């Protein structure tokens, strides 16, 4: 069993056994009912990408290309436009979070990246001094939250560090997430930011190192318990999936495309499970 599958099953068991139920929940299902969840706090995982440990489960199929396209929308296009996400990338799952009739998700994610010129600053800082301890992406912007409505960022902070091992430089990343839908979004979010880490590493010709993943509130919604039990019953694939970025070292961050990524040795258990999202 892969490390990701072991962690996935352990977290499902912990939530079902030790978790507590939410109170005064904000999300709603599409039928209007309150989307309560069972949750644990303070979840942490570590993956050594350089040793082939990737945070993707084999217990169900994960839409990795759509996940990577979302990252490009946020950090390359630096956009909150749903039209761009739909037309350029054929990704539609953000449409349920449209703010009014604006055609956007509000001043969130890519809009914050653009507002503060975050990616250019990170690349400039890493170029000037890779060993500085201030390479932080933060999407938590109270001023923007007051400016428009919209879902507050779930994956809101990423930190980068480098390590020299022998003659190689490794880029490590730490993703902090305030809230995570364990069964639906856990591995999507993790692999998105692994992809971002790989893009930055390629930009500088570095190797990818470790990926650290902290989640404050890790939950399973109350309409997902049957799917959770099914995932626990499933036997994972024996293969260790790995994501590769097929571009030369030194490729500009903004020139990398979703098609440049390839997920190898991925043979997830089927059929896919159905989930009704909480909005």
Curated annotation (Swiss-Prot):
Enzyme class of the recorded protein, top EC level: transferase
Record carries keyword Cytoplasm: yes
Active site: 154 (nucleophile)
Methyltransferase as UniProt keyword: yes
Catalytic activity: dUMP + (6R)-5,10-methylene-5,6,7,8-tetrahydrofolate = 7,8-dihydrofolate + dTMP
Cell compartment(s), UniProt: Cytoplasm
Keywords associated with the record: Cytoplasm, Methyltransferase, Nucleotide biosynthesis, Transferase
GO BP of this protein: dTMP biosynthetic process; dTTP biosynthetic process; methylation
EC number, UniProt record: 2.1.1.45
Pathway: Pyrimidine metabolism; dTTP biosynthesis
Complexes and interactors: Homodimer.
Function, in words: Catalyzes the reductive methylation of 2'-deoxyuridine-5'-monophosphate (dUMP) to 2'-deoxythymidine-5'-monophosphate (dTMP) while utilizing 5,10-methylenetetrahydrofolate (mTHF) as the methyl donor and reductant in the reaction, yielding dihydrofolate (DHF) as a by-product. This enzymatic reaction provides an intracellular de novo source of dTMP, an essential precursor for DNA biosynthesis.
Protein name, entry field: Thymidylate synthase
Organism: Streptococcus gordonii (strain Challis / ATCC 35105 / BCRC 15272 / CH1 / DL1 / V288)
